[in-house]
């Protein structure tokens, strides 16, 4: 995009802390930040407390993956959703969001920053096509500027302020005081955030372990039994029939993994987790988006059986403290739609 001979331009410094959170904004209006809304990447008025505006700049592939100008690759992973920004279909198409698999080198979620294009701003472009850049669609002055909900697309470089970006750490005003906010564990020496798991039928109830069973309980960040590790170590080689990567859900306190039940209507089980052993009975996948960012969680080897908050639908009275998790065929119920998000 800027021609050859720019390898001497310094790349932005990599974050020293993998858990550091960033804000992303463009020169067209620095009072609007990149966020996730209704499963789309848009701009919204800056709000340090809105975790949908918090991003991880994941540099784990930066030493071996670089663009044509030698700039290091990174992924942009949303803190609230765990989704990564993915390349669009081409120029003028909105960028996409997909579940981030930190163990799999997927070029379609990798980006680089250009040299400085003025006042510290840089282009953010596809690692394998530096001619296509993040673009706040119609965010230039001629089209009325950035507004709440401006879509982010890819576009060739037009020297627009709506194509010039900064990725900067949030200040202390963005850091939540909630006890679980910074909870992290390590998998293979890599820091990973614990996650919470909840359904669309009752977002104030989280998956927990109680008396040897997996059930739902009122959300409590202080309750470590509600903290789970989404272990993706087998995802490179194990996928479901739709191509989605497999993962295990391991409880932080008990070290137990959620295991497939004996069939429809039966509760899921908990078993000791052996991370070195490839056991498909503890592996799950997430479906495509089934509405507002929720997804089905289903057996890796039988995607027709899904997590189901038993009798958690409105017709049966909804979610309550102690609602059991069973497997059930897809009935389009809110009690079958789930999110797995960082605490």
UniProtKB/Swiss-Prot annotation:
Lectin which binds carbohydrates in vitro. Interacts through its lectin domain with glycan structures containing specific motifs. The ricin B-type lectin domain binds glycan structures. One of its GO terms (molecular function) is carbohydrate binding. Gene3D superfamilies: 2.80.10.50. Residues 194-340 form the Ricin B-type lectin domain. This is Ricin B-like lectin R40G2. It comes from the Eukaryota. Keywords: Lectin.
